[in-house]
Every structure is written in structure tokens, then in C-alpha cells.
């Protein structure tokens, strides 16, 4: 059986209530697969979204949750060795995969992949980018680390040729310690900012920079990187890129400069900012 085919499968998500994992479970159910999962921390908004999509969530991690045996288990990155379901999956030799790898093979591969990265602002930027493509009638697929109010969901399959993903630098799974964004086949990428974060998996800012440098090397020469031109840490990792770069920000090195515009004389004063090509 080809576990990465679109043939209907019985798929079990261990650690289903994470934002990305719950979103992927919904996408897989919408593709016609039989989906259920388990978690210990079951709380809104993702548990509500799963319930709305009629996806059963078992409370707690138990070997009995895996009976009858599923065709495939998706293991969330919060689960590690010693977890009862992880140990059962290994003992029973069940096929398993990470959330990021499944997302890549079922939804991103074959599409034009746009990935939003950086320490802060990923969810907001991904939501805005998806909405821009939506209003341009591009019908993008997307995976956002939160529920976007404009869409009423955190994820959607692509009807058009684009898939937009929030690219997290956190690790993929206990069996794959690479950052999740390595899986997303980036062709065009936004890099918002870069500073030390995730001290539970990174020992220093230099380790985070290394992960971003490696990720930038995955972007083809025909791709594009839009990066914060004011962030010194971002500028440091951009040296690893082999793709065209557009810098945005306030400073002189930026190709797109942010200009603040204020019109206080209007009956209703407005203040906004726009990017202008130099």
C-alpha cells in the first residue's frame, strides 16, 4: 500500500490538538480519509474545530487507541519516546510519519510553495498573504498557525496552483529533529525577523541561524526571498542564499521602503504605512 497516495486510508493522529496537526487532520478528512486521533491537552480553539469536522478525539495516550490498527499514524512533535502510543506504534511496527512530511507529500508537492518564516509575526503574515492571494482569485491552499477570521479556518486545500505555509523552525518529531520548514519545498519565502527562541531545542542564536541558512539553501535560483532589511540577524543568514532577494523595511539597504503617511486634516484622521519601490 502506498501510504502517500490519495487512496482512502484509516489515519490516526497521535497528538492531534496541536494547531498544525489538527489542521492537517481536517485536510486529510476532507480528502476522503478516515481520521481520528488522541491528545492529553484538549482545549479550544482546535478541539472545537475538530468537533465541527466530526473528528473523534480520544482523551489521553493509550495503546488501545490504536485498535483496530490504522493504516498510518501521524505523530505530533510534542510526543517522545516513553509515550504509551509511541511505544505501541514501534512495538506493533505501524507505519508512521510526521505532520510536516505528510503535509509536504499530500498538499505542497506539485504546487508553488510560499513559506513564511521568522521568529515573530508568522501567523499574521501568513494570514495576510493567504488573503491577498484569495482576493486576487488565486484560490490558494494554506496552513496557518491559528484560525484566520477571514477564512474561518486555519487550513485549506489548494484549488489553484499556490500553497502558503507558516514555516516553523521548531523540530519536526522525535524521529526527525530538523526544523519543520525544511519539509515545505519553499520556492518563495518571507523572512520577517530572527532572534533567539525555542531554548528547549536550540542552545544559542547561532544554532538558529544555522537552521535558517540551511533552509535558504533549499530555495531554487528561480525562487525569491523577501527579507527584513533592517534585521541584522536576517542579513547575516541571507549570505547563504542563492536566490534573488528583495529587502523590505525602513533603512537604506531596503528595496521596498516603509513610508508612514498621516492625514490629520481629514474629518476622520487616518494613519497608515505603505511600501514603496526605491
Role assignments for model-derived ranges:
Residues 1-46, 50-57, 68-73, 91-94, ...:
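ATP-dependent carboxylate-amine ligase
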Residues 4, 27-30, 51, 64-68, ...:
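Phosphate-binding loop of NTP-binding sites
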Residues 12, 33, 61, 120-121, ...:
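Histidine-centered active-site/metal-ligand motif
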Residues 35-39, 58, 73-75, 141-143, ...:
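Short, hydrophobic beta-strand segments that form beta-sheet elements in well-ordered domains
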Residues 112-114, 250, 266:
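Glycine/charged-rich beta-loop-alpha catalytic/anionic-binding loops adjacent to active sites
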Residues 252-255:
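Short coil-to-beta-strand transition motifs
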Residues 259-278:
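Single conserved hydrophobic/aromatic residue that forms the stacking wall/gate
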Amino acid at each position: 500500500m502506498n501510504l502517500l497516495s490519495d487512496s482512502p486510508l484509516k489515519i490516526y493522529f497521535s497528538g492531534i490538538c496541536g494547531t498544525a496537526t489538527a489542521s492537517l487532520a481536517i485536510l486529510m478528512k476532507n480528502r476522503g480519509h478516515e481520521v481520528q486521533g488522541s491528545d492529553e491537552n484538549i482545549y479550544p480553539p482546535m478541539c472545537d474545530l475538530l468537533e465541527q469536522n466530526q473528528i473523534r478525539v480520544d482523551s489521553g495516550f493509550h495503546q488501545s487507541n490504536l485498535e483496530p490498527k490504522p493504516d498510518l499514524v501521524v505523530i505530533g512533535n510534542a510526543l517522545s519516546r516513553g509515550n504509551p502510543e509511541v511505544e505501541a506504534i514501534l512495538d506493533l511496527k505501524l507505519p508512521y510519519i510526521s505532520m510536516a512530511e505528510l503535509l509536504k507529500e499530500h498538499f505542497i508537492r506539485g504546487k508553488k510553495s510560499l513559506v513564511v518564516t521568522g521568529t515573530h509575526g508568522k501567523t499574521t503574515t501568513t494570514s495576510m498573504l493567504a488573503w491577498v492571494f484569495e482576493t486576487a482569485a488565486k484560490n490558494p491552499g494554506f496552513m496557518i498557525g491559528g484560525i484566520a477570521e477571514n477564512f474561518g479556518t486555519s487550513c485549506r486545500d489548494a484549488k489553484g496552483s499556490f500553497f502558503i505555509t507558516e514555516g516553523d523552525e521548531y523540530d519536526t518529531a522525535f524521529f526527525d529533529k530538523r526544523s519543520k520548514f525544511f519539509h515545505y519545498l519553499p520556492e518563495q519565502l518571507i523572512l520577517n525577523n530572527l532572534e533567539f527562541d525555542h531554548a528547549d531545542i536550540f542552545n544559542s542564536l547561532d544554532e538558529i541561524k544555522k537552521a535558517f541558512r540551511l533552509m535558504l539553501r533549499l530555495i531554487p535560483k528561480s525562487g525569491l526571498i523577501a527579507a527584513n532589511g533592517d534585521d541584522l540577524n536576517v542579513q547575516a543568514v541571507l549570505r547563504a542564499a542563492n536566490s534573488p532577494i528583495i529587502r523590505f523595511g525602513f533603512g537604506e539597504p531596503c528595496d521596498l521602503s516603509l513610508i508612514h503617511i498621516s492625514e490629520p486634516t481629514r474629518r476622520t484622521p487616518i494613519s497608515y504605512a505603505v511600501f514603496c519601490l526605491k
